[in-house]
Amino acid sequence: MLLKILITMLSLGAASSVYSVEEIKVAFGNALAPWVMPATNNGIIIDIITEALEPAGYKVVPIYYPYLRRITQYRNRFVDVSSDINVNTMTEESLAGFLSDDAYTYENFAFALKVKGYKFKHLNELGNLSLLSWQGAIAHIGNEYAQMATNNPYYFETNRQESQIQMLFLKRVDVVQLDEKIFDYFRSKVEQNGIVDTTEEVDRFPLFGASSNGFLFHDKKIRDEFNRQLQRLKDSGRYAEILNRY
């Protein structure tokens, strides 16, 4: 009888180890729909890292912060991973860790009301206009953008993309700068909520180029596994399905 109990306990222990998972806390900006949607714990970025790591035995735990605070929480090791990191961000914020391969790409545009009649060809043309961007854009984009923004007395940043939409259509600013998917999402949301009329025509200027991003890990082993699984998602076609879902 004692032997039977011992065998049962060993079997349960083995089963427990097989099905055990390691929780990975991941910091996300809290206002980046459809890339990050805190209310439903999904979105393009969340789905990518979840579907990459969970088959490898990791449980992704999303934690949402005002955009710049995700960096502070990562630096202080309150989280294991931070989203929305590139080489510029690591350099400007003096971050240590292991950066993943490019995992997703923002398409940032300058948006202006068509009635303004702007014909922007270069981002330097924004230097004397009121421009509302997203929090951390100077560090993240860097280079010519950082120079233009730093020298522009009418340049501001916010961690609320919804407020960018409102300010543009209320004619409080000349230009807003943000990702095209985020703009379209919050434009529709603001209109549906009856907050501001967003039906006025808008011009979109691709002045900034694509902004590739990845995840910054404290643990190299987990970063390496993520890179392998990310490639699997891309090779299988699942990555494209995630992008198209939203």
Feature map (PLM): residue ranges:
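Short helices/loops that flank or line small-molecule/ion binding pockets
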Residues: 68-80, 98, 161-184, 189-190
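Acidic, polar ligand-binding/catalytic clefts
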Residues: 50, 63-125, 138-139, 201-208
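Extended ligand-binding regions for polar small-molecule ligands
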Residues: 46-55, 116-117, 123-130, 212-246
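Short loop->beta-strand "edge-of-pocket" segments that line small-molecule binding or catalytic clefts
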Residues: 22-37, 123-139
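Ligand-binding cleft/hinge of the Venus flytrap
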Residues: 49-58, 100-102, 125-127, 135-159, ...
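Periplasmic-binding protein-like
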Residues: 29-31, 105-109, 193-227
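A ligand-binding cleft/hinge motif common to bilobed small-molecule-binding domains
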Residues: 84-94, 145, 174-202, 207
